[in-house]
């Protein structure tokens, strides 16, 4: 018996182990016929590769710096039939067979894009509603932190089920699209609630739900005529991503030898007098230490990111993408990414977070910009941060010849800088800024005026969750968490619920009814 066990163990030891395959599957009939498949497993880099599937040819095997990856490039002919191909690996007699599915595109509706006829409702899932308390902790998360609603920067337990449970509420409000803050895995020891430090680009964080639940959420939104905009981050990953400890290529991250923080000076990207040092610090510097900066100049990384976005569009039928920290990533790489998305999905829309305090800075980033002489970003939509900066004082204060609403007039008078002013995402607040209301107002006159302006002026308006019930707060009084507070009634044990008229104060009800009529 001992000899049998030993023999079986020896056979097992000879097998190659592949523990991760990205993308997990793909489709036939895509516009770009080249597919990159990234394999990960101990010492698989130098394995010979063989594939025999009608219509599929292995064009290239890229063996990176790490011994634990392979990048396989396949060409899929237009007449390739759906099915499962087998990728055979052989390293000196140690073998592995990796099944890989090529699906048929299902043709379901969705991936529709969004435009100025839409109104986006921005949700931070962790703070909106906890529909499934059983997933607040998950064994697959190594760096799990406890749910504690008393701590602003802790997880509070909101999830996809919570958003699903309140879709009728969102629908009745009258918005036509939901922008969801990041829901991909964030296996990080701190701050994971906000989702901006991705540790797996193909997996919904299990504390939010599953890939299947996300797909169901999108389907249910579409059934109600509501679009879904997915938040993505290509500038950086989280330091908890397996890439950080086992980098496929030495240049997978910028400043690979250690943490160098960005200078946050986006003006360097269009400054005619900029030094190479300052510009490099802006683009290649890390956003924070827990978010190492990805190097989009590495062609294999860029191909990975492009395919990742296409995979989510095709598998979930999301209608748009909001790209975080867009200008901090490589200009040419991101322009190529957008071109590839538009090639596959003509009429799609992507909005980039281009956080400038000037109209010229924002206009630099819009597709076919009049002021960008360095290249075409291809970015259809930019965000109107100038409006959010000027809005509160303009609407709440006095207006004279130079201030108040004249600031808004002067802002709009500069729309000639933009090739498409209708493709500007307009907002008065979001998850990164102070709430439009720093505290609950004594009267709603100026608040109503601001809502009317937002929803009737040029651009694509966005409303932050809770605006309709006068949620308020400033970052100065408690950091980011103070402007990302829980939606009352979305969590077990809440004593009141603003999801129903009976749970709202008279002033909240007045605001809710007014905004609903506008929408």
Predicted features by range, described:
Residues 218, 236, 241-244, 308-310, ...:
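Active-site-proximal helices and loops of the catalytic beta/alpha 8
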Residues 95-103:
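Edge beta-strands of extracellular beta-sandwich domains
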Residues 1-19:
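Bacterial Sec-dependent N-terminal signal peptides
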Residues 102-122, 127-132:
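Low-complexity, Pro/Ser/Thr- and charge-rich linker/hinge segments at domain boundaries
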Residues 128-310, 315, 334-349, 360-362, ...:
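Substrate-binding/active-site clefts of carbohydrate-active enzymes
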Residues 30-93:
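Immunoglobulin-like IPT/TIG beta-sandwich domains and homologous Ig-like subdomains
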């Amino acid at each position: 018996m001992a000899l049998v066990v030993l023999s079986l163990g020896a056979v097992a030891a000879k097998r190659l182990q592949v523990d991760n395959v990205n993308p997990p599957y793909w489709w036939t009939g895509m516009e770009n016929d080249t597919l990159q498949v990234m394999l990960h497993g101990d010492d698989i880099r130098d394995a010979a590769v063989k594939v025999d599937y009608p219509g599929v040819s292995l064009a290239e095997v890229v063996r990176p710096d790490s011994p634990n990856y392979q990048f396989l490039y396949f060409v899929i002919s237009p007449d390739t039939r759906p099915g499962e191909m087998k990728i055979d690996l052989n390293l000196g007699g140690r073998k592995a067979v990796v099944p890989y599915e090529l699906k048929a595109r299902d043709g379901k509706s969705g991936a529709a894009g969004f435009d100025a006829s839409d109104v986006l409702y921005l949700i931070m899932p962790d703070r909106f509603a906890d529909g499934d308390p059983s997933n607040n902790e998950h064994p697959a998360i190594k760096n799990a932190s406890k749910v504690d609603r008393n701590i602003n920067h802790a997880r509070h337990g909101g999830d996809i089920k919570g958003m699903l449970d309140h879709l009728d509420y969102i629908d009745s409000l009258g918005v036509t699209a939901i922008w969801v803050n990041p829901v991909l895995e964030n296996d990080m020891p701190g701050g994971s609630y906000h989702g901006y430090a991705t540790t797996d680009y193909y997996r919904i964080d299990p504390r939010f739900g599953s890939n299947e639940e996300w797909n169901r959420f999108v389907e249910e939104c579409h059934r109600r005529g509501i679009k879904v905009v997915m938040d993505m981050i290509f500038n950086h990953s989280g330091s908890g991503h397996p890439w950080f400890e086992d980098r496929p290529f030495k240049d997978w991250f910028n400043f690979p030898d250690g943490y160098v923080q960005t200078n946050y000076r986006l003006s360097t990207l269009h400054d005619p007098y900029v030094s190479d040092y300052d510009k490099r610090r802006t683009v290649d510097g890390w956003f924070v230490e827990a978010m190492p900066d990805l190097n989009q100049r590495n062609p294999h990384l860029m191909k990975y990111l492009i395919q990742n976005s296409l995979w989510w569009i095709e598998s979930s039928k999301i209608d748009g993408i909001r790209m975080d920290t867009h200008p901090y990533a490589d200009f040419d790489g991101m322009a190529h990414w957008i071109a590839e998305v538009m090639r596959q999905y003509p009429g799609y829309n992507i909005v980039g977070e281009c956080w400038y305090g000037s109209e010229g800075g924002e206009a630099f980033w819009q597709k076919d910009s009049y002021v960008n002489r360095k290249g075409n970003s291809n970015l259809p939509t930019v965000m109107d941060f100038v409006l959010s900066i000027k809005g509160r004082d303009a609407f709440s204060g006095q207006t004279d010849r130079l201030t108040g609403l004249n600031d808004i007039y002067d802002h709009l008078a500069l729309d000639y800088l933009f090739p498409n002013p209708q493709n500007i995402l307009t907002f008065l607040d979001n998850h990164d800024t102070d709430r439009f209301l720093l505290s609950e107002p004594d009267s709603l006159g100026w608040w109503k005026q601001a809502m009317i302006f937002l929803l009737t002026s040029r651009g694509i308006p966005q409303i932050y969750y809770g605006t309709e019930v006068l949620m308020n707060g400033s970052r100065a009084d408690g950091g980011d968490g103070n402007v990302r507070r829980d939606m009352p009634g979305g969590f077990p044990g809440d004593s009141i619920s603003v999801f129903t008229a009976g749970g709202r104060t008279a002033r909240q009800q007045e605001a809710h009814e007014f905004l609903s009529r506008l929408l």
